[in-house]
């Protein structure tokens, strides 16, 4: 596994990530950005990565409405996703994260079929580009967020994976460890985002390690699921900005790093067990 962080795609962002001692960055080219801001500058972005030793580990587009009121694919939304899949391919980025919005007036089964059609279109487009498609478990213009939706949709699309974030499951009152154990083999990308609930209410998303997520157990499930992708730090709190926010990012790096087995770690044999 490789620890990285969400950040921008300009040179200053790559420099910042490298100064943190990290070697991977995630781009969130959300609905409020034109996809060509990334897709139109891949040569430049690739040069930044080589200069600072930082790989692009994930690209995603959150908040994009992809399906219209009739349940049809919105062509411009599809084009944005295709542009970013092309960008991921050009940058050597292994995963692209998407969602699919709910269509009012359609049944659950019909919405699942719409999502299968949309995700299937992206999977077909990504073939031969070394990019895998993952659906995020955030509900921002996306209804494919729990096992109820994953069972029919991922069941129909064996190449579709998950971008998993424990905080979203916690926010829905779910059991993130149960979800991870059941679906760990389908996790293509993973967010490191702290979350804290008090008396059943959301209190804050503090830096990971200063929150209530059991990160050691989370890592055990990822290891047992043979996950070997990016662990992407997501700062996500207005209480943790400025100097304290930066300290929080650095704290999370120091907290998570010892949980990651080094890539060059070797041992001849196996620990004794009676």
Put a short name on every predicted segment:
Residues 27, 57-60, 93-100, 133-136, ...:
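Short beta-strand segments at enzyme active-site cores
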Residues 26-49, 100-107:
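Glycine-rich, proline-tolerant flexible connector loops at the mouths of alpha/beta enzymes
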Residues 1-2, 57-68, 102:
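N-terminal small/glycine-rich loop or linker at the start of catalytic domains
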Residues 1-3, 7-23, 77, 92, ...:
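Histidine-acidic metal/acid-base catalytic patches
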Residues 1-10, 31-32, 38-45, 76-80:
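N-terminal-biased segments
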């Amino acid at each position: 596994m490789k620890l990285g962080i969400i950040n921008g795609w300009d040179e200053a962002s790559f420099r910042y990530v490298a100064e943190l001692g990290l070697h991977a960055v995630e781009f969130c080219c959300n609905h409020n950005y034109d996809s060509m801001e990334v897709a139109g500058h891949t040569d430049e972005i690739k040069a930044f990565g080589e200069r600072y030793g930082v790989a692009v580990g994930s690209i995603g587009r959150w908040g994009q409405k992809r399906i219209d009121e009739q349940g049809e694919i919105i062509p411009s939304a599809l084009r944005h996703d295709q542009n970013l899949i092309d960008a991921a391919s050009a940058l050597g980025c292994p995963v692209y994260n998407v969602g699919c919005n709910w269509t009012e007036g359609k049944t659950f089964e019909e919405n699942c079929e719409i999502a299968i059609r949309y995700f299937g279109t992206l999977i077909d487009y990504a073939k031969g580009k070394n990019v895998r498609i993952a659906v995020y478990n955030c509900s921002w213009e996306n209804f494919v967020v729990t096992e109820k939706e994953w069972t029919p949709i991922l069941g129909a699309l064996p190449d579709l994976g998950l971008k998993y974030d424990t905080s979203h499951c916690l926010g829905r009152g779910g059991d993130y460890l149960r979800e991870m154990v059941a679906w760990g083999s389908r996790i293509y990308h993973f967010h490191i985002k702290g979350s804290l609930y008090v008396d059943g209410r959301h209190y804050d998303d503090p830096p990971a390690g200063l929150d209530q997520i059991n990160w050691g157990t989370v890592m055990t499930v990822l290891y047992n699921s043979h996950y070997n992708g990016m662990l992407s730090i997501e700062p996500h709190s207005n209480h943790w900005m400025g100097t304290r926010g930066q300290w929080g990012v650095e704290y999370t790096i120091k907290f998570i790093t010892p949980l990651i087995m080094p890539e060059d770690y070797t041992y001849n044999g196996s620990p004794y067990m009676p």
